[in-house]
């Protein structure tokens, strides 16, 4: 058995795939779980057959994912929708600077995409998100909402640790910085 992670972004937004899919898979593996990652466009229902949990990251509803949710429920396999932006309810879309410049057709298409994320969220057993604010908002739509913050990968930590400054030396010099 394994945790199946379905990436709806498919690395089109690399930082989303990195933090919400690949780093999550690495984190789960470090805790002893077997994890399989698949892009949404490559997903087949048979991939979920031996999964114990299914996490769907930022994927719009589709007939195949809806069938997955129904089958998973039938077989007692929890499905979580992972989302890290307010892109699951159109109540927020008028407030975005991005949508201000869209014509009515473009705005309609954008809102349709947001509604499709919302429908996917509704069909899952719970949600996973990255911030306290999103967690609170998601409680309006799901009773089970897990907080899993974005994490640095082991590779990034290894690279960063090479540049850690030694602050153990004391000095009488006071340094002031303006940010």
Specify the residue positions occupied by each region the protein language model found.
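Short catalytic/ligand-binding loop motif for oxyanion handling, primarily in non-cytosolic enzymes
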Residues: 13, 45-47, 62-65, 87-91, ...
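Structural motif
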Residues: 53-57, 80-82, 128, 177
């Amino acid at each position: 058995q394994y945790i199946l992670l379905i990436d709806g972004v498919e690395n089109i937004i690399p930082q989303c795939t990195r933090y919400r899919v690949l780093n999550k898979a690495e984190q789960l593996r470090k805790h002893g779980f077997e994890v399989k990652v698949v892009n949404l466009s490559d997903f087949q229902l048979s991939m979920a057959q031996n999964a114990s949990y299914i996490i769907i990251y930022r994927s719009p509803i589709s007939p195949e994912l809806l069938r997955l949710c129904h089958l998973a429920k039938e077989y007692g396999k929890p499905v979580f929708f992972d989302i890290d932006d307010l892109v699951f309810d159109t109540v927020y879309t008028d407030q975005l600077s991005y949508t201000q410049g869209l014509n009515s057709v473009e705005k309609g298409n954008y809102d349709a995409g947001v509604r499709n994320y919302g429908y996917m969220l509704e069909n899952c057993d719970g949600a996973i998100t990255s911030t306290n604010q999103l967690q609170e908002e998601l409680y309006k739509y799901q009773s089970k909402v897990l907080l899993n913050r974005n994490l640095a990968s082991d590779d990034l930590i290894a690279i960063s640790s090479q540049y850690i400054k030694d602050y153990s030396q004391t000095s009488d010099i006071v340094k002031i910085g303006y940010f």
